[in-house]
């Protein structure tokens, strides 16, 4: 598997935003159409204890969503569905050429699986792409309240604005260094202060 730097993943997602004139909360299914990808629902068995939410069939230019988990995928205006489709667009953008050239093997025949919680590097790349696509850094920065801020309501409001679930929003904010959680697991603006750092420069 080829290593893809996170900044490259962010840049590829930003290119899609620019090329397709996307806005916050955009219609992921319309984006699939514009990318020339189809979408179907079909029953897919979970694998090895992992919940399979979706698949990409790159040779058929087709995204498959698992109808066995339709209730979960469609909760809260389909937020997990949006994230799963973003994940499959990530596979298409990052991995489809390598698959077609034979330099990247598929996980199962001619399908790439989207397993919930998978730590496979290829899956992690697609996960990072989905986060960058649905919560682009520049748009998220402009939506943040000025620091300092504290509490879950800020994270919930941003999740509602970007049509994603709260957990991926919190992870995205933490990864960008715009939020950390205190000892009570409460979101707080900014990066966490390293233990003892407060005492380095006493007032």
Task: Identify the meaning behind each predicted range.
Residues 1-203:
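Active-site hotspot residues in diverse enzymes, especially metal/ion-binding acidic/histidine motifs
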